[in-house]
Amino acid sequence: MSEAGAASEAVRDAALRLLARREHTRRELAQKLARRGHDPGYVHPVLEALAEEGLLDEGRFAEVFVRSRVERGQGPVRIAQELRQRGVADGVIDEVLEDAEVDWLAQARAVRERRFGAGVPADRREALRQAQFLQRRGFTADQVRAAAAAADEDDERGPYG
């Protein structure tokens, strides 16, 4: 085997070992392989081949990523931002978030209740603190308002609706 063939095979083996652990984006995989000393001239053709073979799939990565972040209680804004940082295209992000079938309003409400309890905030300062918490978690302003309004409605209906 030629030197170029051996180098290309080494890159492929390293990439497959990384992909065996978890899904990666093309950018993540290229960065990890470069940090391990692999020549970028060999990395990019190998990544192309892996993508053509279906072994490197950013859509699949994004689906797994969205599921894990939803389980952690993160909102769509933060999830999209993190996917962009990892090099996932906006079209893929939009598609995956839409296909995730997450009720973001219910998610925001559940995250708020898990952190602060089901009661209504005692004052404006507490309401602001809760809203800022939800925004940091990646929920939109509309989702934050809806979660706060749901707490108000629950409080007015009492514990038995």
From Swiss-Prot:
<dbReference type="GO" id="GO:0006282">
    <property type="term" value="P:regulation of DNA repair"/>
</dbReference>
<dbReference type="GO" id="GO:0005737">
    <property type="term" value="C:cytoplasm"/>
</dbReference>
<dbReference type="Pfam" id="PF21982">
    <property type="entry name" value="RecX_HTH1"/>
</dbReference>
<keyword id="KW-0963">Cytoplasm</keyword>
<dbReference type="InterPro" id="IPR036388">
    <property type="entry name" value="WH-like_DNA-bd_sf"/>
</dbReference>
<dbReference type="InterPro" id="IPR053925">
    <property type="entry name" value="RecX_HTH_3rd"/>
</dbReference>
<protein>
    <recommendedName>
        <fullName>Regulatory protein RecX</fullName>
    </recommendedName>
</protein>
<dbReference type="InterPro" id="IPR053926">
    <property type="entry name" value="RecX_HTH_1st"/>
</dbReference>
<dbReference type="InterPro" id="IPR003783">
    <property type="entry name" value="Regulatory_RecX"/>
</dbReference>
<comment type="function">
    <text>Modulates RecA activity.</text>
</comment>
<dbReference type="Pfam" id="PF02631">
    <property type="entry name" value="RecX_HTH2"/>
</dbReference>
<dbReference type="InterPro" id="IPR036390">
    <property type="entry name" value="WH_DNA-bd_sf"/>
</dbReference>
<dbReference type="Pfam" id="PF21981">
    <property type="entry name" value="RecX_HTH3"/>
</dbReference>
<dbReference type="InterPro" id="IPR053924">
    <property type="entry name" value="RecX_HTH_2nd"/>
</dbReference>
<comment type="similarity">
    <text>Belongs to the RecX family.</text>
</comment>
